Each structure stands twice: as structure tokens, then as C-alpha cells.
Amino acid sequence: MAHPAQLGLQDASSPIXEELLHFHEDALMIVFLISTLVLYIITTTVST
């Protein structure tokens, strides 16, 4: 059950939704790593 101040997704009620939650976590980590890499590249390019 979702709560009013909940920041994440609600608990999965089926195996497919459980796999979607795992996919969401993996995709979020990949986006974070790519964003960090792009920020590093921009920072090194601007500083030289």
C-alpha cells in the first residue's frame, strides 16, 4: 500500500512488478553513472 509521503514505489504484488522494481533500480544506477561521467568530462573540459 502506498503512503502519502512515500518517496519510492509501492511494494510489488506480483512477480512481474517485482522484476520491474529491480529494473527500475538498475536503470537508475546506470543513469546516475552516466550523469557522473558526463559531469566529470564537462568539468575537465572547462577547467583546461
Curated annotation (Swiss-Prot):
Catalytic reactions of this protein: 4 Fe(II)-[cytochrome c] + O2 + 8 H(+)(in) = 4 Fe(III)-[cytochrome c] + 2 H2O + 4 H(+)(out)
Membrane topology designation: Multi-pass membrane protein
Residues exposed to the Mitochondrial intermembrane side: 1-14
Annotated GO MF terms: cytochrome-c oxidase activity
Taxonomic source organism: Polypterus sp. (Bichir)
EC number: 7.1.1.9
EC class name: translocase
Cellular compartment(s): Mitochondrion inner membrane
Annotated protein name in UniProt: Cytochrome c oxidase subunit 2
Cofactor(s) recorded in Swiss-Prot or TrEMBL: Cu cation
GO cellular component terms listed in the entry, alphabetical order: mitochondrial inner membrane; respiratory chain complex IV
Ranges per topology, Mitochondrial matrix: 46-48
Alphabetically ordered keywords of this record: Copper, Electron transport, Membrane, Mitochondrion, Mitochondrion inner membrane, Respiratory chain, Translocase, Transmembrane, Transmembrane helix, Transport
Summary of subunit composition and partner proteins: Component of the cytochrome c oxidase (complex IV, CIV), a multisubunit enzyme composed of 14 subunits. The complex is composed of a catalytic core of 3 subunits MT-CO1, MT-CO2 and MT-CO3, encoded in the mitochondrial DNA, and 11 supernumerary subunits COX4I, COX5A, COX5B, COX6A, COX6B, COX6C, COX7A, COX7B, COX7C, COX8 and NDUFA4, which are encoded in the nuclear genome.
Chief location category: mitochondrion
Protein family per UniProt: Belongs to the cytochrome c oxidase subunit 2 family.
Stretches that traverse the bilayer: 15-45
Function: Component of the cytochrome c oxidase, the last enzyme in the mitochondrial electron transport chain which drives oxidative phosphorylation. The respiratory chain contains 3 multisubunit complexes succinate dehydrogenase (complex II, CII), ubiquinol-cytochrome c oxidoreductase (cytochrome b-c1 complex, complex III, CIII) and cytochrome c oxidase (complex IV, CIV), that cooperate to transfer electrons derived from NADH and succinate to molecular oxygen, creating an electrochemical gradient over the inner membrane that drives transmembrane transport and the ATP synthase.
Gene Ontology biological process: electron transport chain
One Pfam family in the UniProt entry: COX2_TM
Domain of life: Eukaryota
Cofactor detail note: Binds a dinuclear copper A center per subunit.
